[in-house]
Every structure is written in C-alpha cells, then in structure tokens.
C-alpha cells in the first residue's frame, strides 16, 4: 500500500459501561472512578469515566484495520488525555499520515479522538511499521 502525507482513516464507536467493566477486568485496573458510580459521584467528574487507555485503544483499531492496515506494527505512541470520556460517549478515532519514511516502511501519524460534540479527548502521534500488504 502506498501511503501519502494527508491520508486519513477513522472509526466511530460508542463507549458503553460494559466496555469499561470488561477493560477493568482484562487489565486489572479497577480504579473506582471507572467502576463505582457512588465513588465517581464524589469526584470532579461527578460520574464514572472510561479508562484513558480504553479510549486510546480505538486508535490501534484504526491502524490495524484501515490505515496503514493489516500487518502493521505499532512502534510507538504519544498520548495526551485532554478531556474525560463518559460511558455513552460516541468516540471517533482518526489517524492522519504526517510523515512517510520511504524505504524503511515507517510512517508517523497524528492520532486524535473526539467525542460526539467534536471535542478532542485524546491527541498524540503514532509511529508504525507498515505491513507487507
């Protein structure tokens, strides 16, 4: 696949409380801000929030399935968690090619997640080894 600066792909998914609970169970991160509504109501957010890494994992889905696609290998990722994600939020994860290292099969991509109000919740940069396909 020939990649060019500016190429973009995205996915959209609603983060459900069941996703948050499953992520907590898989990772062992049972911070009550994510899984205990009574506790979460006492925090600055006033309700449960999704794990930042759960939301960021949508970026991995875009990279693996769309751009660059199959066989791609994550080499690195920077992330800034800009705003909370709440169960029920619709998140769009978008990646945009910003650099192509010809001959090395490596690309850099801007990574941004936004909510249904078009507010940025995560931003960062990924470095990816492009797959054989």
Tell me what each language-model feature is.
Residues 1-50, 132:
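Catalytic strand-loop segment that frames the active site of acyl-thioester-processing enzymes
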Residues 1-5, 85-133:
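HotDog/MaoC-like acyl-thioester-processing domains
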Residues 25-29, 64-68, 116:
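Short, intrinsically disordered, mixed-charge
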Residues 32, 68, 84, 130-131:
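Proline-rich low-complexity regions
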Residues 42-50, 57-94:
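Hydrophobic beta-strand-centered segment that forms part of the acyl-chain substrate-binding groove
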